Each structure stands twice: as C-alpha cells, then as structure tokens.
C-alpha cells in the first residue's frame, strides 16, 4: 500500500492556491413572464437600460423599450416561437449596433446588418449604434453643393443639395420609388455612396429594385437594407435607423452619401403597432405621442458636416405615401415640417402621361437655387413661375375661345415646356444636357415646333451634341455657368440643329398665322363653292 506523504499534499495544495485565478462572472438575469406578438414582458432586470440589447434563449436577441416599475417591455428581433414563459433573459450591457464599412457596399442586408443575398458573410470594419445623436449646429455648414437627380423637372425647379432632406410625397403608383431610383442611377461616377432602405415592401418589389440597380451598374456604390412586409414590426421599426448608421460611416469619413427611406408611412405604422402592444397610450389616429420625435431624430442625422469634421454629407430622400392626395394627414404634415422641402407627385398628372408627375405648385425646395449649379439657375429660374402661370391660364382658357396674342403665346410656351419636362424612367440626364434642352425651351427655340415633335427634337439634340458639339458640353460642365461667349455658342448650336431637324421633319413646324389664315380662307371658299353647287 502506497504511503501518503503529508508534505507532498501540502505542497500541491499550496501550488493550486497560488495559481488560482478567481474569475467570477456576474450576469444580471431576468425571467420572461409573458410573451406574444413579438413583445416580451420581463421581471428581474432592475438595472436594464433603455434600448439595451437583451439575450434570450436559442440565440434570439431583444431590445428593451419600456422600463416600468416592476417589469421591462422588450421587443424581440427574430424568430421567437421557441421562447417560453419562465425562460431566462440576460442583459448584455450594450446598445444595439450594426456593422458598417466599405464591405457593406453592393450587399443586401436586413435591419441588423446580416446579409440576405447569399453572397457570404460581411467583413465589416466597424460597428455603429443604430441610435446616434445628430450633429450639432457648430459641426454643420450650409447646404451649397448640388446633388443632381438627373431629372429635368426636379433639377431645374426643385434643386436638391448635398446634406438636404427632401421629401418625396404622393399617392400609391405615382412614381415615388422611380424618382429615388433615377437619383441613385444618376449618381454613378459622382463620388456618392447610396443607401436604399425598403420598409414594409413586398419581397418581390425589393427584388425588382435590386435587379434594376444591378442592371444599371448602381450596386457598385449602393447598400440595400430590407425589412420586408413579412417581417415583424420591430425589424421594420429598426430598419431606417440601421440604414442611417451605415450611411453615417461614409459621411463621417469625409465622403458623400445619399439615403432613401421607402417609405416612412409604413415605418410609422410599425411603430404604432409596437407602441400599442407595449400598452403605450394612443393619440391622434392611434399613433403614440412621440411619433413626431420618431422621424425628427431620424432625419436630423442627415447633414453637411463642417470642414473641421471632414466636410462629408448625408442627403436624405424620405418617401411618404398619401391617401387620395391628402397631404394634411398626420404623418405627411409631420414629415413635411421636418424636411427642407417636398416633391409632390400627383395621380392626375401621372395618369395624363406627365412623368415624372411633379406638381410644380405644391413642390418646393427650401434650400432653393443656392444648391444648384449656376447654369441651371440661369436657364431654369423662371421655369417654375412660367409653368404655374400656364396651369392657371389653361384652366381659364377652357371657358373662352377669344384669347389675346400674349395669352395664346404663353399657353403655347407652357404646352411645350410641359412636354419638355417629361422623361422616361431610368434615363437620367447630365447637367450640361439639361442646360441645353432647358435653354431651348425657355428661349423660344421650340415655340414654332409642334408639341408631338418635341420628344423627337430632344432625342435628336442629345445625339447631335454628342456627335458634333462635345467641346461645348465639356465647357458647360467645366464652367458651370453661361457667360456671353458660351451663351452665343449654345444659340448657334441650337439654331444649326433646329434647321437640320426641320429639314428632316417638314411637317414639324407650326404654320405662321398668315399661312394659317390663308389656309382657313381657302377652306371657307371651297366650302362655299360646294354649297353653291348643291
């Protein structure tokens, strides 16, 4: 039998005690007391923070939203079907954050920044909290740089600047998403990173958007964040904040970013659902009292930073869907008051073939032409007023046929300008192309061309400029303003092209009044002769 030596045991025990490293892990743990509709009520988390991430069983996370006296109301982010009453919940001590960085570009992710495009994991360089304070007044500078959308109707009358918040508002099926996508496609090669945030849309619609962006090469500089209609309300609520955090990474690194929220009406509905399930008191239209703050704290994060902060910018194009054109409803008026202007798209204009269906009278940019390049301002500054006056005159002209010559000229010019501002989808124009065609419209080059030929005139003009006047376009793009010399060259180019166009299309010219009168007399004589013969 082996003899036990006390000194060896003592030595071993002393060694164990000396090497013992006391690591005590303390977790604050609570219990699920009720669960339903994506909302969990928890007991025992006395030191829980508002907005803190909570760890549930089966790898599900939640976010604390209601801090009550004896319990915590949390929203669940993910599949909660396996969680039961009585399950344990742990505090993480962290605020919800999402991955950010250049690796996000070209990817489709959900509200938590997890990839959903089957292209593998994302090696993100950093993580940002979804809720961040907006930059202060000292950290900002005024909006001065233009952000071209490529749409004549917007760039010439409702110019948008980098760092601005411009609302796109209208009924369903009026082309709101199309305007936003055109802006993304037009951003190619303009040093702009785009983030498209789809909130509460059908997966098929989002797939169509992603395919369109890929087809035009726009995914190379775009991040797509998706919270589809089939996902629970907490994911819809988080989506715009997560997307903004991803866009802020580029802004904070001195780059320029554009974010599109499509749309904030569904975001407000998701927040209303969450609030009612959390038993918060309802207000107007059953929305909670802080629904204004919901959108104001989101949209205030879009800004143009000062040079000391890197000079980056984040431009926001939130989308709001109205019901039967009612812009005075609760959510539309809230977002109109938060943003720096709105682009109002009208169903009647859309159905009559005016696309983009921008209602010039109700649309406005509160930054104005300080954000537009000077050449656009020179050719388009009177356009909005001319079109508004044309609409008024057109309404009155229906009641009487005897119009003086000045009124008739104004109506004719208005018809041609309206036709000129129509634009096919996904065909954005450069600033210099817009300057040329708007100059032609506002300076009377189209006054003697029949309205049905305006579209052909415009298409031919772009081909002519590319083939014969490339230097002129380059000079407009470089100078960004029309001086006397450049204005003369523009007129010469337009006169030359117009003559060629009329030679090819002889019936495109409007007959002069003398010729029209002679034709009318001839018709009357022929009718009188025919009557006498009978």
Swiss-Prot record:
- Region (Disordered): which ranges? 505-534
Q: What is its main location?
A: membrane
InterPro entries the record matches = ATP_synth_asu-like_sf (IPR023366), ATP_synth_asu_C (IPR000793), ATP_synth_asu_C_sf (IPR038376), ATP_synth_F1_a_nt-bd_dom (IPR033732), ATP_synth_F1_asu (IPR005294), ATPase_a/bsu_AS (IPR020003), ATPase_F1/V1/A1_a/bsu_N (IPR004100), ATPase_F1/V1/A1_a/bsu_N_sf (IPR036121)
According to its UniProt record, which reaction does this protein catalyse? Answer: ATP + H2O + 4 H(+)(in) = ADP + phosphate + 5 H(+)(out)
Q: What is the annotated localization of this protein?
A: Cell inner membrane
Keyword Cell inner membrane attached: yes
Keywords linked to the UniProt accession:
ATP synthesis, ATP-binding, Cell inner membrane, Cell membrane, CF(1), Hydrogen ion transport, Ion transport, Membrane, Nucleotide-binding, Translocase, Transport
Entry's Pfam families?
Answer: ATP-synt_ab, ATP-synt_ab_C, ATP-synt_ab_N
Enumerate the residues marked as the site Required for activity: 363
Binding-site positions, ATP: 170-177
Q: What class of enzyme is it?
A: translocase
Q: Which GO terms describe its cellular component?
A: plasma membrane; proton-transporting ATP synthase complex
Name the HAMAP family on file: ATP_synth_alpha_bact
NCBIfam families for the chain: atpA, PRK13343.1
The family this protein is said to belong to = Belongs to the ATPase alpha/beta chains family.
Q: How does it assemble?
A: F-type ATPases have 2 components, CF(1) - the catalytic core - and CF(0) - the membrane proton channel. CF(1) has five subunits: alpha(3), beta(3), gamma(1), delta(1), epsilon(1). CF(0) has three main subunits: a(1), b(2) and c(9-12). The alpha and beta chains form an alternating ring which encloses part of the gamma chain. CF(1) is attached to CF(0) by a central stalk formed by the gamma and epsilon chains, while a peripheral stalk is formed by the delta and b chains.
- Tell me the protein's name: ATP synthase subunit alpha
Give the organism, scientific name. Acidobacterium capsulatum (strain ATCC 51196 / DSM 11244 / BCRC 80197 / JCM 7670 / NBRC 15755 / NCIMB 13165 / 161)
Encoding gene (name): atpA
């Amino acid at each position: 039998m082996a003899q036990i030596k006390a000194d060896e045991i003592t030595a071993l025990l002393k060694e164990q005690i000396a090497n013992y490293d006391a690591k005590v892990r303390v977790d604050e743990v609570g219990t699920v007391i009720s669960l339903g509709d994506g909302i969990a009520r928890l007991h025992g988390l006395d030191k829980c923070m508002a907005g803190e991430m909570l760890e549930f069983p089966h790898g599900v996370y939640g976010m604390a939203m209601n801090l009550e006296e004896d319990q915590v109301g949390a929203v669940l982010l993910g599949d909660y079907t396996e969680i039961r009453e009585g399950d344990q919940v742990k505090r993480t001590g962290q605020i919800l954050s999402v991955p950010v960085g250049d690796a996000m570009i070209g990817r489709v992710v959900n509200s938590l920044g997890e990839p959903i495009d089957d292209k593998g994991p994302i090696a993100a360089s950093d993580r940002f909290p979804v809720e961040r304070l907006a930059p202060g007044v000292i950290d900002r500078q005024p909006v001065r740089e233009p952000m071209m959308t490529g749409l004549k109707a917007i760039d010439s009358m409702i110019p948008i600047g980098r760092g601005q918040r411009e609302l796109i508002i209208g009924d369903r099926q009026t082309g709101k998403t199309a305007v936003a996508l055109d802006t993304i496609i037009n951003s190619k090669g303009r040093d702009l990173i785009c983030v498209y945030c789809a909130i509460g849309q059908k997966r098929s619609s989002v797939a169509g958007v992603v395919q369109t962006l890929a087809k035009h090469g726009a995914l190379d500089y775009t991040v797509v964040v998706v919270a589809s209609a089939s996902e629970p309300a907490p994911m819809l609520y988080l989506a715009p904040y997560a997307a903004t955090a991803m866009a802020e990474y580029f802004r904070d690194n001195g780059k320029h970013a554009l974010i599109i929220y499509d749309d904030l009406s569904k975001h407000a509905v998701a927040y209303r659902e969450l609030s009612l399930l959390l038993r918060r008191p309802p207000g107007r239209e059953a929305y909670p009292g802080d629904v204004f703050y919901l959108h104001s704290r989101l949209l205030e994060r879009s800004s143009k930073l000062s040079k000391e902060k890197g000079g980056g910018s984040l431009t926001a194009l939130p989308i709001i869907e109205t019901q039967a054109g009612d812009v005075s409803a609760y959510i539309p008026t809230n977002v109109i008051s938060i943003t720096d202007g709105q682009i109002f798209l009208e169903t009647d204009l859309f159905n009559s073939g005016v696309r983009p269906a921008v209602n010039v009278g109700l649309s406005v940019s509160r930054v104005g032409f300080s954000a537009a390049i000077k050449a656009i301002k020179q050719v388009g500054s009177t356009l909005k007023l001319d079109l508004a006056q044309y609409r008024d005159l057109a309404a009155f002209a229906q009641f009487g046929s005897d119009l003086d010559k000045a009124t008739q000229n104004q109506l004719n010019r208005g018809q041609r300008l309206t036709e000129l501002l129509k634009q096919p989808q996904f065909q954005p124009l450069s600033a210099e192309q817009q300057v040329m065609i708007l100059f032609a419209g506002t300076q009377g080059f189209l006054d003697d061309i029949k309205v049905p030929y305006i579209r052909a005139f415009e298409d031919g003009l772009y081909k002519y400029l590319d083939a014969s006047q490339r230097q002129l376009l380059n000079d407009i793009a470089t100078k960004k303003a029309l001086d006397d010399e450049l204005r003369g060259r523009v007129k010469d180019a337009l006169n030359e092209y117009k003559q060629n166009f009329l030679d090819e299309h002889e019936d495109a010219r409007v007959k002069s009044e003398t010729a029209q009168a002679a034709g009318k007399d001839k018709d009357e004589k022929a009718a009188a002769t025919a009557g006498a013969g009978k």
